[in-house]
Amino acid sequence: MSDVERTEFEIPGGIPPRRNGGQGRAADTNVDANLKPDEYDAEVTLRPKSLTEFIGQPKVRDQLSLVLTGAKNRGVVPDHVLLSGPPGLGKTTMAMIIAQELGTSLRMTSGPALERAGDLAAMLSNLMEGDVLFIDEIHRIARPAEEMLYMAMEDFRIDVIVGKGPGATSIPLEIPPFTLVGATTRSGMLTGPLRDRFGFTAQMEFYDVPDLTKVVKRTAKILDVGIDNDAAVEIASRSRGTPRIANRLLRRVRDFAEVHADGHITMGAANAALIVFDVDEVGLDRLDRAVLDALIRGHGGGPVGVNTLAVAVGEEPGTVEEVCEPYLVRAGMIARTGRGRVATAAAWRHLGLEPPEGTIGDY
């Protein structure tokens, strides 16, 4: 029997055991949905180029198709578009597709990069008619730039201030009609005036396993990697409903299959690789389990404040709150209460422990 047919693999040094505790760094996790700097080039090659090629998000795709087709038929630029949702679900890809579908150029920037009104004015003055301007993390745009954006979105003009003090003058500058696509992971942080200027808003949802399986298979085809269906399902089921994580895990499993087998990804190769990279059967990694361990073994299941949990696992509070906690809450393993975070019965059982009587979710 060849290595690729086995369900067990011999790895130099052995497969590291899963630990329910221990420390983890956000930069090392394979299940952080934020884009890592060294992943940009890989992501570009994997992005779909059209709405029909885009997998998942059927409601958003159908709505956007209507908006774009209607605008093209009328010969006008589409309304400004706001895409909301957690990282890794395809907001940037959707902005690229919008420009592709319209046959126009895409200009990209981010909210944190627009610190002054002049930064935004420079970008707007270089737009051509019909261009798509994509602002990622638009909720982080500086107030002076945001106020300039109001007029640009509504009237396609801006006022440029020349000079300082009493001698300063305002020069109106017409800009070509354009479509702004804003992306945000925190739509609640958008000001009302900015949110109201978007003609179309869409909420990107987490993916189910069937759609994520399609994503894994499509990526494997692009990467020229053979993969069995059950292996694709296994990778998808551990990807937290997020295509970016699914693609990252597939690349790690590919590495394993190339080193320890013949490069073809079987169920055995997928399982063994995900053990090596410390991603368990429900998508938790070492840091997630360390948080649960600190909450349950260290504090009896809570309630515990996020700062205390962060100290216990050796992480920054922001990392625990933004990287770990959202998925643990969505997976039903942590509940937020007025007094702090509380472990649910599912969390106790995930660590192989019996939950005390009265634990949340213990029916």
UniProtKB/Swiss-Prot annotation:
Region: Head domain (RuvB-H), residue numbers: 281-363
Coiled coil (UniProt feature): none
Name this protein carries in UniProt: Holliday junction branch migration complex subunit RuvB
GO BP: DNA recombination; DNA repair
Localization: Cytoplasm
Entries under NCBIfam families matching the protein: PRK00080.1, ruvB
Protein family: Belongs to the RuvB family.
Residue ranges of the region described as Disordered: 1-32
Gene3D superfamilies, A to Z: 1.10.8.60, P-loop containing nucleotide triphosphate hydrolases (3.40.50.300), Winged helix-like DNA-binding domain superfamily/Winged helix DNA-binding domain (1.10.10.10)
Example GO molecular function: four-way junction DNA binding
Source species: Corynebacterium glutamicum (strain R)
GO cellular component, one term: cytoplasm
Matching PANTHER family: HOLLIDAY JUNCTION BRANCH MIGRATION COMPLEX SUBUNIT RUVB, PTHR42848
Domain remark text: Has 3 domains, the large (RuvB-L) and small ATPase (RuvB-S) domains and the C-terminal head (RuvB-H) domain. The head domain binds DNA, while the ATPase domains jointly bind ATP, ADP or are empty depending on the state of the subunit in the translocation cycle. During a single DNA translocation step the structure of each domain remains the same, but their relative positions change.
Function: The RuvA-RuvB-RuvC complex processes Holliday junction (HJ) DNA during genetic recombination and DNA repair, while the RuvA-RuvB complex plays an important role in the rescue of blocked DNA replication forks via replication fork reversal (RFR). RuvA specifically binds to HJ cruciform DNA, conferring on it an open structure. The RuvB hexamer acts as an ATP-dependent pump, pulling dsDNA into and through the RuvAB complex. RuvB forms 2 homohexamers on either side of HJ DNA bound by 1 or 2 RuvA tetramers; 4 subunits per hexamer contact DNA at a time.
Residues reported in the UniProt entry to bind ATP: L46, R47, G88, K91, T92, T93, E154, D155, F156, R197, Y207, R244
